[in-house]
Amino acid sequence: MNSSGKRRLACGVGAVVAAVASATLAISAASASSDVTPPAGITVPADSARGAILVASLEGRNEVTAGAPVGQALELFGIQGNTLTYSVAWRGIGTPTEAHLHAGARGVDGPVVVPLFTTPRRAGGFASGAVTVPDSTLLAALRSDPGSFYADLHTTNFPGGAARAQLHLLTHPVATSGVAALQESVVLGSQIYACIQQPDGSFAFTQHDVAAHLIGGIHHTFVQPVTGPPQWQAPDGSAVSGTVVAKNGNGAGNIAELNLDATQIGASTGLLSHVVEVLRLNTVGGVAPTGVCDPQATPIVNVPYQADYIFING
């Protein structure tokens, strides 16, 4: 997907998120209606065997059969007992007619395991609700192996699927008052690699820094080149750094998807002031050049990349 077609997305499970910009997709109290109502708060106990929060960053390009060219959505799921609560915000697609959870790996169409809704939603860019899932084995699999499942949205124009994404488990303990998520996409970004001597005496490109501008004016770099850690700074002074806790490959030629534990390093109020976890998803490009490099001829290379960053407030 062309990054210029992306916008900010926000949604919440167990929390109401206010719109923070005209381009934001959010669940807000003012937009509640009789058939699309922000869900009541869900309690997520520390024992992950009993409860969990999952997130999916849906893209049209993730569909096996081409989906909406600029389709994008952000979806949160809460599992508590045999109840699965969902909240989804979307843009770049028509109003969804159906939403499901499927069993299946990336690039593979799989069977529906949980129908979320099977009738058209009202216009408004979001939907939420809860379904009962009596299959305890399925719920256990969603918690223990979320990457083997994907979420998708269907529309009239794309009945086979407008946007989809694999599920990801949030790893940070979630406050019992609920969880909310904000998605910002890279507008312009590069993974920066330096030609460094390796233990065997050869030279190869290794991670040096990152430089990316995200929608919403967030600037993404390393706190210190080489040693890091990565950081995200909002225009309002709020900021977080991240420590990688999980890494998943995303195909040849693409940097890995990451799950990072967030540490507050900026202002106590602002866009990122309540972020506890960051996910880097839907990565495209950014991989270091392979082979031997010459530190005199090419000491530094900037490799363009795209990604969606999900900021979790807990």
Map each language-model feature to its residues:
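Secondary-structure junction/capping motif
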Residues: A10, I27, F205-T206
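Bacterial N-terminal signal peptides
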Residues: G14-A26
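Intrinsic-disorder/low-complexity peptide segments enriched for small residues
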Residues: R7, A23, A56, N82, ...
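Metal-centered catalytic cores of metalloenzymes
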Residues: N2-C11, S31-A99, A103-Q191, Q197-P199
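Ubiquitous "structural anchor" signal
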Residues: V20-S22, T118, L169, V245
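Primary mode marks residue(s) on the alpha4-beta5-alpha5 output face of response regulator receiver
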Residues: L169-I192, P199-G314
